[in-house]
Amino acid sequence: YKRQVRAVLSVSPGGREAQWPDQQAVSALAAASPFNTATATALPVFQLPARRPDVIHRLTLAGPAANYAWTINGALYDPRRGAVRQGQRVRLVFDNRSGMFHPMHLHGHTFQVLTDGSRQGPRKDTVLVPPHASVAVDFDADNPGQWLSHCHNVYHGEAGMMTVISYVD
């Protein structure tokens, strides 16, 4: 795939000329491998306390269908709400069955990415799910409401790849 590298240049009227970044450093960045969450971890202060999940929601990502539909669990905007209760540890398993990357986002919470299936990785609100791969994340249900989870490739979300996590009594 093609990689783009951008540099931010700060210039003010009458100031010194912009300093271009070191071309060797830019070339090294452009040739680097994509970020791998298996090697990243959160600082201990940001990790969720170790605990088994109380509920697991599997979100199967698929598409595009003949009409360019992107789905979660076989539905456009999956009407089956992912039910959670206040205080639960919730695991979302994003199972990508498509040939594209999907940056999956959850509103209202941050989650702990699980690497190697169980080791606590980085703390995020969006995780990149590679083609034909699964990524599991855990979050604590501590912000009641109805929270959208969707693909951050906007055209995938608009074409149906979204669902709602709902707190129930």
Q: Where are these predicted regions, by residue range?
A:
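Extracytoplasmic beta-sandwich strand-turn segments characteristic of Greek-key/jelly-roll folds
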Residues: 76-83, 108-144
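Extended terminal and domain-junction accessory segments
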Residues: 2-93, 98-101, 140-146, 153-169
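Beta-strand signatures of extracellular beta-sandwich domains
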Residues: 103-105
